[in-house]
Amino acid sequence: MGHFYFVRHGQTVWNVENKICGATDSPLTEHGRKQAAETGKNIVESGIKADEILYSPLSRAADTAKIISEMSGIPCREEPRLIEQNFGKWESTPRDGKEFKKAKESFACRYEGGESMLQLAQRIYNLLDELKQESGHKTYI
């Protein structure tokens, strides 16, 4: 079986503004681009060898992956199932809002207009299972 390294995208505009951005596209800040470059540098310096970088269709993930790819020489491709959880009506609202915190307590419940944590987990587990079956001993970031 291969290996998976998980990397989070760099800082986004909505991270700075303390907004929930889940499946909504929020671009990287300049600091986020620097974080992506630092991650790419760390991957190279650590000697991590990967066959492919997979990223979500959101620009913050795509830009992070492409910066890492440029620095490491590892090819990258978009994988739609890696899109972040859809928080539905909570997208663009404050992360620390009382109503959102209350809604998060219902782990298995779907956010109105979005998806539940369980739905997200199922989507990701299906992808990981598929990659393990298709790729044998490949390593992914």
Regions found by a protein language model. Name each.
Residues 56-58, 81, 138-140:
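Short, well-ordered beta-to-alpha junction loops that form the rim of enzyme active sites
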Residues 25, 108, 129-132:
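A broad detector of the eukaryotic-type serine/threonine protein kinase catalytic domain
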Residues 2, 7, 11-74, 78, ...:
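Active-site-proximal alpha-helix that buttresses catalytic centers in soluble enzyme cores
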Residues 4, 62-63, 70-73, 126-141:
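Active-site-adjacent alpha-helix immediately C-terminal to a catalytic or transition-state-stabilizing loop
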Residues 70-126:
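Phosphate-handling substructures
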Residues 37-44, 121, 125-133:
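Generic structural signal for well-ordered alpha-helical scaffold segments
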